[in-house]
Amino acid sequence: TTQGCNCSIYPGHITGHRMAWDMMMNWSPTTALVVAQLLRIPQAILDMIAGAHWGVLAGIAYFSMVGNWAKVLAVLLLFAGVDAETHVTGGIAAKTTASLTGLFNLGAKQNIQLINTNGSWHINRTALNCNDSLNTGW
């Protein structure tokens, strides 16, 4: 089955196989994010054990001795990333100044042009009758 589309990224007819292939090609950032998070696990466990409070270490030791590994995992997850606070001299003034000057930032900007070509209206040269399932942003 083919589908007619007047998009700038898919001129002419496009098969479902081509659309599926393009969607699979967009998985690579997600896969990279998942792998990066998985690779953090050993270091996170080491940090939790090496830099833990004595009470957390006692809880891990007790629950591991009685064989309750679910509670060991719960203790590790509950106290992951718990660190002491750091007070920076002048930090509040710096944050206030940064938020005040942030009001004058231009922010995100996209030039949008409405173009009439041969009686057909386009936004940035992408046809308005394009099938939205192709995720062109329009």
UniProtKB/Swiss-Prot annotation:
Stretches in topological domain Lumenal: 1-59, 81-138
Residues carrying the site annotation Cleavage: 84-85
One annotated GO biological process: fusion of virus membrane with host endosome membrane
Recorded GO CC terms: host cell endoplasmic reticulum membrane; host cell lipid droplet; membrane; viral envelope; virion membrane
Annotated signal sequence range: none
Keyword Nuclease appears in the UniProt entry: no
Pfam family name, one: HCV_env
Glycosylation sites: 6, 118, 124, 131
KW Glycoprotein (keyword) present: yes
Region listing for HVR1, in residue ranges: 85-111
Highest taxon, organism lineage: Viruses
Coiled coil stretches, renumbered: none
InterPro entries: HCV_Env (IPR002519), HCV_NS1 (IPR002531)
Bilayer-spanning residue ranges: 60-80
Keywords assigned by UniProt, alphabetized: Clathrin-mediated endocytosis of virus by host, Fusion of virus membrane with host endosomal membrane, Fusion of virus membrane with host membrane, Glycoprotein, Host endoplasmic reticulum, Host lipid droplet, Host membrane, Host-virus interaction, Membrane, Transmembrane, Transmembrane helix, Viral attachment to host cell, Viral envelope protein, Viral penetration into host cytoplasm, Virion, Virus endocytosis by host, Virus entry into host cell
Family: Belongs to the hepacivirus polyprotein family.
Note: Viral particle assembly takes place at the surface of ER-derived membranes in close proximity to lipid droplets. NS2 associates with E1/E2 glycoproteins, NS3 and NS5A, which interacts with the viral RNA and core protein to promote genome encapsidation. The nucleocapsid buds at the ER membrane where E1/E2 glycoproteins are anchored and afterward associate with nascent lipid droplet to acquire APOE and APOC. Secretion of viral particles is probably regulated by viroporin p7.
Protein name: Genome polyprotein
Origin species: Hepatitis C virus (isolate EC10) (HCV)
